[in-house]
């Protein structure tokens, strides 16, 4: 049976393009469309969809306002945001949307040529396939993330080991990170390097928001900076992140612009993990994080 998708966008052209893309996959069917969040709210009150593709900026009720209303009223939805890369405000709103229940997002094309191109088609179908594969249909929208009132106590490690945590996230990663990073203790006895597969512009917004929510420091990684304990370094979108041993035996961040995307990903987690073999760390914990609904 095909998965029923609701498309919400104020542009008639974008609605048609996204519906055509969705219908081109035999697993999906663009069952309904709406011009704004208010129309979508009325539909979602009475109809369950397997997925919702939701624009950010719309008249009457925008995407974030719709998510807040769904959350408040406990209306079920699996939401993928569509957000403009060139608008820094939309990047911030998209990160907030993850707290309001959105599972992931895709970058909105800037013109009709891009909208009808293969890259956007692959991106939209790829995210829908991944999201619906890891989600129960019509998962309840979750409460907003709140900082931990008290971080769990950390036991002091013995032996003076030099440790590193390396995190990788893909589909649903931003949502999953909001359930993990805010609960890391400020005194974590290791730096954390993190690759989230996101386009440029969004990683800075995500780092800033996670820093606001967390006791541990969170920042977008910078080329050449030395890794410090108790800090999370997020790879910037559009750049590969590597860890390199310095001449004095410490470790620093290397941001790689030159290497092409690997499997369509830049940053690519595999490249980060490969670089760790040349670092000076005694213990490295590697984690791949994916958001899934509870059983």
What are these regions (language model features)?
Residues 44, 51, 56-57, 70:
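Residue immediately C-terminal to the conserved phosphorylatable aspartate in receiver
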Residues 2-6, 12-23, 33, 38-39, ...:
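Conserved acid/base catalytic micro-environments in cytosolic active-site loops
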Residues 33-51:
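Acidic, metal-coordinating helix/loop segments flanking the phosphotransfer/catalytic sites
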């Amino acid at each position: 049976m095909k998965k029923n998708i609701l498309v919400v966008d104020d542009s008639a052209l974008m609605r048609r393009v996204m519906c055509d893309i969705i219908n081109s996959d035999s697993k999906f069917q663009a069952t309904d469309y709406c011009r704004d969040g208010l129309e979508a709210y009325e539909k979602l009150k009475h109809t369950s969809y397997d997925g919702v593709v939701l624009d950010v900026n719309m008249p009457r009720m925008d995407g974030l306002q719709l998510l807040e209303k769904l959350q408040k009223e406990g209306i079920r939805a699996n939401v993928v945001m569509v957000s403009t890369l060139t608008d820094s405000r939309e990047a911030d709103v998209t990160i907030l949307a993850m707290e309001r229940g959105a599972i992931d997002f895709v970058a909105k094309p800037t013109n009709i040529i891009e909208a009808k191109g293969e890259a956007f088609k692959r991106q939209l179908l790829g995210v829908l396939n991944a999201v619906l594969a890891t989600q129960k249909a019509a998962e309840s929208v979750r409460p907003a993330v709140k900082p931990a009132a008290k971080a769990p106590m950390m036991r002091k490690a013995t032996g003076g080991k030099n440790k590193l945590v390396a995190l990788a996230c893909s589909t649903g990663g931003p949502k999953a990170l909001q359930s993990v990073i805010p609960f890391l203790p400020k005194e974590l006895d290791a730096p954390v390097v993190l690759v989230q597969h996101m386009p440029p512009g969004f990683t800075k917004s995500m780092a800033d928001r996670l820093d606001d929510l967390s006791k541990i420091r969170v920042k977008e990684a910078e080329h050449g900076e030395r890794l410090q304990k108790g800090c999370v370094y997020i790879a910037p979108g559009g750049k590969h992140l590597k860890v390199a041993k310095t001449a004095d035996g410490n470790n620093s961040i290397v941001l790689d612009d030159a290497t092409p995307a690997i499997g369509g990903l830049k940053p690519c987690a595999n490249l980060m993990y490969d670089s760790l073999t040349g670092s000076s760390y005694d213990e490295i914990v590697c984690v791949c994080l994916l958001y899934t609904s509870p059983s």
